[in-house]
């Protein structure tokens, strides 16, 4: 089940405001989706995700297949029952994780043979197997199995011929994924994935073939895989707005706050990335005025919160009143610096709450600006603020 309602568009860009209706609820777009690799978003309670406005989260098909395994998940009726999340879930196909195994895997037309990174067992993932796993997970949005085209192969930029061969196999896998998805009578929604590397002609070919399959939604894959930023932005400017206008568009694995704003301007509706959670665990925080390295010595005695305009629990405490509005209930940079220096678990947890809140609030501001016809102004202000620096 999937219904996508296009609510408004921005006349000065390809940005759009929409509403996605799935089996487990509605999602207002544009949206950022926190990543819950092993069935949890690292370092944050599900209650906190609800409080900060998370509407949909991700699960990782590959890792959940390996642990806890399908028998366990089936016993709970799928991923929603297992992790006690009652809103929509999107699961990836497992293709990127298998691709990341490098020498431990062998890709053939039939699928991917690989050694389990957990116990070394020999395993096989095909489009059909991926659909079977994701049907057991009962995720609201299911991704086709694809081959992620790398930016470089053995230190050299992937050739157009190699990218074409990879893209065409992903198209064949898309058809096999669709056939198996339908055979299983899966009531959820299957997305296709546009590939083609950094070659716009291949992206266009992939896009046209997938659009002809009339899938419920489409993703742009194979970006943020080691290419220079200008190359990623070029593909981002080329592909999203060419996808069917009445279907949701998902940019996979991207990215920084600036990337999200630019993606929205190019017509993207959905984003996911591990950056807010991973960076939080490594002491890098996103703020209105740029990124903050909380481990730096200059924060040792700083009484300010991470972001004076932020209303997250970390910055504003239980009152939810931002520092700039007179609130003084949040945690200081000095305290967070201390937690990081001491290796206290609470440090990364509070940082994760802040980063995820920042991303989700950024998307909320974008939706509000689109509703008000003020996206161009918001885009300019966000760019200027972030460039200013903390």
UniProtKB/Swiss-Prot annotation:
This is Queuine tRNA-ribosyltransferase. Its cofactor is Zn(2+). GO terms for biological process: queuosine biosynthetic process; tRNA wobble guanine modification; tRNA-guanine transglycosylation. It catalyses: 7-aminomethyl-7-carbaguanine + guanosine(34) in tRNA = 7-aminomethyl-7-carbaguanosine(34) in tRNA + guanine. Binds 1 zinc ion per subunit. Substrate binds at residues 92-96, 146, 195, 222. Homodimer. Within each dimer, one monomer is responsible for RNA recognition and catalysis, while the other monomer binds to the replacement base PreQ1. It comes from the Bacteria. Catalyzes the base-exchange of a guanine (G) residue with the queuine precursor 7-aminomethyl-7-deazaguanine (PreQ1) at position 34 (anticodon wobble position) in tRNAs with GU(N) anticodons (tRNA-Asp, -Asn, -His and -Tyr). Catalysis occurs through a double-displacement mechanism. The nucleophile active site attacks the C1' of nucleotide 34 to detach the guanine base from the RNA, forming a covalent enzyme-RNA intermediate. The proton acceptor active site deprotonates the incoming PreQ1, allowing a nucleophilic attack on the C1' of the ribose to form the product. Pathway: tRNA modification; tRNA-queuosine biosynthesis. Zn(2+) binds at residues 310, 312, 315, 354. The gene is tgt. One of its GO terms (molecular function) is metal ion binding. Residues 253-259, 277-281 are annotated as: RNA binding. The active site is at residues 92, 272. Its EC number is 2.4.2.29. Belongs to the queuine tRNA-ribosyltransferase family. GO terms for cellular component: cytosol. Keywords: Glycosyltransferase, Metal-binding, Queuosine biosynthesis, Transferase, tRNA processing, Zinc. It comes from Verminephrobacter eiseniae (strain EF01-2).
